[in-house]
């Protein structure tokens, strides 16, 4: 089940296909600009400098002993191991991560980092490893509604239903978009995503829309009460390297492929969500 949830990063179709094409073009362009030797240094020293903002659990945070822990931290360790290195974490405020990368203070940024097309002149992005987009959630065992994979299309699934959302969030915007095409769809705004999911469990709403991170956190804390049935939007998390660290960028993508194929990424998702 967790494996299938992780693979939902690929269900968005068009958006992620365009992203993968853009990433491939970016890497091809970078190949004509030479390599800065970062991969050689990483392998020679056995150290991969990883920039992150350790204030975003469960992706990255500090434990009581000051150690960096979380999904991204474990991903960095697994990725570094495939490069025959150990990660050296550099804790930086999120707004300073790109500057640190471009100033050669870190080799990669692994920090719940969304793909940003405006940055592709300066950095190479990896393939996505997590989709933090908006998802549709139902109560577990709700026999009145049928989830993804059924023959019931989305308009019929939600017609005449109430959907809980965090007011003013991307989920709220997505619900407003759905209301334009789904008859009698009502929204139930809540102060936070967690409260929107709580309203679903309490029976105040028939469904909820929230970002995937909030949903996975809620599912972890409330085992068996809700189920994710549809990915509605894509917000891929990616790893960034400098534009001239093209060999390192390729090694990162190769490592991610290996971690995905080996089931390591699924195992990390199960551990942290």
Roles of regions detected by a PLM:
Residues 48-49, 84-86, 102-111, 161, ...:
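Alpha-to-beta junction loops
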Residues 60-63, 76-85, 155-157, 171-189, ...:
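Ligand-binding cleft/hinge of the Venus flytrap
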Residues 131-138, 212, 216-257, 273:
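Periplasmic-binding protein-like
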Residues 139-163:
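Flexible hinge/capping segments at coil-to-helix
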């Amino acid at each position: 089940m967790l494996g299938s949830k992780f693979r939902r990063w690929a269900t968005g179709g068009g958006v992620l296909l365009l992203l993968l094409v853009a990433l491939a073009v970016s890497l091809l362009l970078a190949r004509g600009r030479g390599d800065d030797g970062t991969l050689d240094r990483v392998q020679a020293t056995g150290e991969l400098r990883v920039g992150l903002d350790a204030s975003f659990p469960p992706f990255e945070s500090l434990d009581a002993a000051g150690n960096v822990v979380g999904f991204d931290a474990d991903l960095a360790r697994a990725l570094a191991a495939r490069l025959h290195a150990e990660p050296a974490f550099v804790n930086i405020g999120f707004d300073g991560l790109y500057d640190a990368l471009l100033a050669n203070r870190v080799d990669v940024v692994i920090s719940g980092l969304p793909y940003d097309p405006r940055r592709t002149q300066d950095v190479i992005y990896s393939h996505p490893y997590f989709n933090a987009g908006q998802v549709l959630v139902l109560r577990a065992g709700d026999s009145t509604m049928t989830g993804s994979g059924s023959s019931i299309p989305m308009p019929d699934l939600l017609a005449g239903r109430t959907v809980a959302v965090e007011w003013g969030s991307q989920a709220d915007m997505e619900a407003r978009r759905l209301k334009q095409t789904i008859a009698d769809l009502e929204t139930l705004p809540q102060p936070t995503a967690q409260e929107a999911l709580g309203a679903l469990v309490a029976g105040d709403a028939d469904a909820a829309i929230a970002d995937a991170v909030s949903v996975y956190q809620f599912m972890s804390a409330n085992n068996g009460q809700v189920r994710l049935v549809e990915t509605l939007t894509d917000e891929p998390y990616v790893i960034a390297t400098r534009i001239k660290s093209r060999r390192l960028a390729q090694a990162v993508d190769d490592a991610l492929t290996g971690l995905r194929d080996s089931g390591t990424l699924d195992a990390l998702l199960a551990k942290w969500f």
